Structures are given as C-alpha cells and as structure tokens.
C-alpha cells in the first residue's frame, strides 16, 4: 500500500467513525463511544492535512490549465506560473508532513504519567533545583489543561526536595513529557554562596507510565505492607490512628512510603499506584535491555543518568544536549513555557524515525 492508499484509508475510516459516533446505539454505549471518539481524534490531524493536500494538487492542475489557456496574455501566464510554483512547493511540504503523520504512533502517548524528581549531586542546591523543576512542570501542566497532583514529597531543611512524586493526567501527557527522563544540570550562584561563585548541581527526572491494576497485576504475596503512625516536623507522631503506609515489593526491594493523606485507605491506594508504576517500569527496562530494542526512543541513549539538559542562570540559557538545542530563555522555560523545547524534541524524534523508515 503506497502513501496515497494509506491516506485514503485513513480518511475513509475517519468518515466511517463520524457516522458511527452519530449512531444512537454507539452514543448509549459509553465505553465504545469513548474508544471511537479517541480514534477519531487521533486521525483528525492526518485527515485535515490530507484534504488540504488534495486541494493543493487541484491547485496545480488549475494553474497548469490556466497556463495552457492564457492565450498569449503575458500577465495571466506569469500569474499562473507563480501560482504553479507556489503550489508545487506546498505539495512538497505537505508530503513531508503527511509522512510524519503516518508514522506508527506510540500506543502509550495518551497515557497519564507518574513523575519523579530527585535532588542528586549538589546537596541543598540540587534539592532547591528539584523544586524549580517541579514548579516548571506544574505550570506547564496547568497551561496544557492537565491535572497535576503531588503524591509524595520528601523535603530538606532549606525548602528543597530530596524527592517528589506527582501524578500528571490529561490528554497526550506521555507524548509530551516522555523525553524528560534523565539528569537536569543547573549552573547558578547558590543563595548560600557569599563569594558569588557559580556552582553546578544536578536533579534527576524519571517519567513512568501510570499503570492500572488491570494492566499490571502484582501478586499480593510479593508485597509487604507496614502500617505506622504518620510523623510531622521534628519526627513527632501527628495521628493517634496509624494511617501511614509503607509497601515493599519483595522481589525487587522497591519501596514506597505514603503519609500525605489522612486515612490509611487513601495512603494505601496512592502507594499502590506508585509501586505498580515503579515495578512495571523496572521490568520494562530489563526487557528492553535484553532485547536491545530500546524503549529509550531515538533521542539520547535512554540511560536515566544521562545528562539531557543544562540550565545556565548567569547566561539565561537552556541547552538540550540530545538535539543540540540552545535557547536564551531560561526564565521563560522555568516559568512553564516548555512548548518550544517539547516541540523540538517531538520533531527530532519524528525525523529520526522517518529516516529509519526510508533506509
């Protein structure tokens, strides 16, 4: 099947979906209606571009016809030739765009994520920068219309985060944040630095897919669940009833502690959500390493300790080392305006995959 047959098949299916979504039987079946709506939405951009492309092809035919029928009218012929030139350039642009739109979609792109940020090398300054990254992602999520919920947080004495875990849910969350895993380096003068020297610190980000219980089932025998009293500042117990939960996955020794909520049940539910994501992610990594068919995507090495980005405060500069992108917009980016970075990463990934297909 060539690209034109593929595009026509997508358009035919899109029109069929439009009819199905108007069918009362489908409308009354919520699950099927949602599935078909999602499929229609995923094809919409491709169909719109294909229809515009067909119009460009018609414009080429019309311009060629106009040249033939210009009847010696130099001005009309010149205008038609310019229209033909413009239409042919548009045709090439649309063909590249449509090839990218037809690339196999990551089946996980519409999924929610669990985001982990940790202060790494650099002590208090690294923990403070972890907080800056948390704020950046929170504001980006807000701008996207996503829900951002901090599920677990371990703070240090200066207001930074040793570790913070958040659930990000909404449309196309994973598709836009999947490239954020790795080491984020910051270069700036710490608040505590009296000599004005620039220090380098690092925070790590890990993006994991939210995993539903029906998608990944953990054997209860593999879990140890401890219930204890939640503690507040200074270590004092703040609840008379034991509400804090610690869950350990015994085969991997992956551990989650949760005391953010007021009830044991809610803490347990949140802890299970995190541990399910971590365990699934752990085994997915092993499987991919064994197959050497990297889950890593084509961007970077996929190593979670790989330095992916540097934030240089003195020069107001952000550099993404994987794609050689440098922007003198650090303040803008840290305020949550990540679109320029995300779009560049998505485009680079698509271009690399297109090159692989063309080999």
Swiss-Prot record:
Database matches in Pfam families = PCRF (PF03462), RF-1 (PF00472)
**What molecular functions are annotated in GO for this chain?**
translation release factor activity, codon specific
After translation, the protein is modified as follows: Methylated by PrmC. Methylation increases the termination efficiency of RF1.
Location in or out of the cell? Cytoplasm
Report the GO terms under cellular component.
Answer: cytoplasm
User: Which region is the signal sequence?
Assistant: none
Q: Which Gene3D superfamilies match?
A: 3.30.160.20, 3.30.70.1660, 6.10.140.1950
UniProt xrefs under InterPro entries: PCRF, Pep_chain_release_fac_I, Pep_chain_release_fac_I_sf, Prokaryotic/Mito_RF, RF-1
Keyword hit for Cytoplasm: yes
Per the entry, what this protein does is: Peptide chain release factor 1 directs the termination of translation in response to the peptide chain termination codons UAG and UAA.
Family membership, please give it: Belongs to the prokaryotic/mitochondrial release factor family.
NCBIfam families noted in UniProt:
prfA, PRK00591.1
Q: What is this protein called?
A: Peptide chain release factor 1
Ranked from the top, the taxonomy reads:
Bacteria, Bacillati, Bacillota, Bacilli, Lactobacillales
């Amino acid at each position: 099947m060539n690209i034109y047959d593929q595009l026509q098949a997508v358009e035919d299916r899109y029109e069929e979906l439009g009819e199905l979504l108007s069918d009362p039987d489908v409308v009354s079946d919520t699950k099927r209606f949602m599935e078909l709506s999602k499929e229609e939405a995923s094809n919409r951009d491709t169909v719109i571009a294909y229809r515009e492309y067909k119009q460009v092809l018609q414009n080429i035919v019309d311009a060629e016809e106009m040249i033939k029928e210009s009847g010696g009218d130099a001005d009309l012929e010149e205008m038609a030739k310019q229209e033909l030139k413009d239409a042919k350039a548009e045709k090439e642009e649309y063909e590249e765009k449509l090839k990218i739109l037809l690339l196999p979609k990551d089946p996980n792109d519409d999924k929610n994520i669990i985001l982990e940020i940790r202060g790494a090398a650099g002590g208090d300054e690294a923990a403070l920068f972890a907080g800056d990254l948390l704020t950046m992602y929170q504001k980006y999520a807000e701008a996207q219309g996503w829900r951002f919920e901090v599920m677990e947080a371990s703070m240090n004495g200066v207001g930074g985060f040793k570790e913070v875990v958040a659930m990000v849910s909404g449309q196309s969350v994973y598709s836009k944040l999947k490239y954020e895993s790795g080491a984020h380096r910051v270069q700036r003068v710490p608040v505590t630095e009296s000599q004005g020297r620039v220090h380098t610190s690092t925070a790590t980000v890990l993006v994991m897919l939210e995993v539903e219980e029906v998608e990944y089932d953990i054997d209860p025998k593999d879990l140890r669940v401890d219930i204890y009293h939640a503690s507040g500042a200074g270590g004092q117990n703040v609840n008379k009833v034991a509400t804090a939960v610690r869950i350990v996955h015994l085969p991997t020794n992956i551990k989650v502690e949760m005391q953010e909520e007021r009830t044991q049940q809610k803490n347990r539910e949140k802890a299970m959500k995190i541990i399910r994501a971590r365990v699934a992610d752990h085994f997915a990594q092993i499987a991919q390493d064994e197959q050497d068919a990297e889950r890593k995507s084509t961007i970077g090495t996929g190593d979670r300790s790989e330095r992916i980005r540097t934030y240089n405060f003195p020069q107001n500069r952000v550099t993404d080392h994987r794609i050689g992108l440098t922007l003198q917009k650090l303040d803008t980016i840290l305020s949550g305006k990540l679109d320029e970075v995300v779009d560049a990463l998505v485009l680079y990934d698509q271009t690399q995959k297109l090159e692989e297909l063309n080999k």
